Structures are given as C-alpha cells and as structure tokens.
Amino acid sequence: MATWAEVAAAEPELVRAGERLLQAFTLAFLATVRADGGPRVHPVTITVHDRRLYVFLVHGTPKRRDLLRDPRYALHSFPSFPRGTVESYVDDELVLFGWARPIENAETRAAVAAVHNDTVHERDLLFELEVDRAQHKTRRDGTAVYTRWAPGTSRDAAT
C-alpha cells in the first residue's frame, strides 16, 4: 500500500490528472465489500490534503460499516468534466484500488475537516485511502491512453 504522495513520486502526471478530476467535482464513486461479499457503490466527497486522500463517512452508513469490517475499496472519479463547452469535454477517468484506514488523530482530523468541501459532524469517521493500484485514462486523437501504477511498477500504454 502507498500514500497518494508515494504514488505522486512515482507517477506525477497520473496524480496531477487524478487530482484535477477529484477537485472538479469533489465527488467520486466509492465501492466497498458488503458483509455477504457483494459490491456496494456510494458517492462520496474526496479530500486531498497534504498529498494524502481522505474521506469522511457518516455514522451508521453501510459504507462505513463495510470499511471497518473489510478495508478494501475501489474509487472511480466522475469520468469527464467540461473545458468550457460541451464540444470540449475531457474524457478522463481515475480509478484507484486499495485499503481504507481509519484515522483517529485529532490534529489530522481537524486539518482535513478545515479543507473538506462538505459539513463534517462529530460522529463522522475519517478514513485515509491508501493505494494499491491506480489508473488514469485519457484520450489522444480518439485513442484511449492509460497510465497505470502499482507498487514497484509504472507504465504508459495505449489501448
């Protein structure tokens, strides 16, 4: 597992593109593993702070219970954002896989809450999203181009 900063050190362009997507909407889709082993997908507000990825989860929500029981997650950014007009949409996507780690440090919680783009309640639990694999997809001249990262590897490939 790696922090977002460690991914940035290995694949800075992937992280820059990913942060543009995450900051364009501040929302992404978080997939967790239900108790029966099935997938569950939720929209969440993502916060990038100090080169780390965080999410606050409300008390009592299924996604919070899922991550406390099984920390594996997948995160998918919204797939496109406008560059002024409909004709200039950017067809980019960010997908992350990893483990969510609960953060109980009060200083970290306060620092993330200060820059979080939504209301944070006392019972909300902060998780850091550690990364096992990352992928950014864009299009160049109509061709999908993927940049992938995993610990010890990186590659740029057209598909």
Task: Briefly describe each language-model feature range.
Residues 59-60, 132:
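A generic "binding-loop/recognition-motif" signal
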Residues 28, 53, 73, 100, ...:
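Short beta-strand segments in beta-sandwich/barrel cores
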Residues 1-13, 80, 84-159:
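Charged, gly/pro-rich active-site loop segments
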Residues 4-34, 159:
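Short, conserved active-site entrance elements at the starts or edges of catalytic domains
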Residues 12, 69-71:
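Proline-centered flexible-loop/turn and helix-kink motifs
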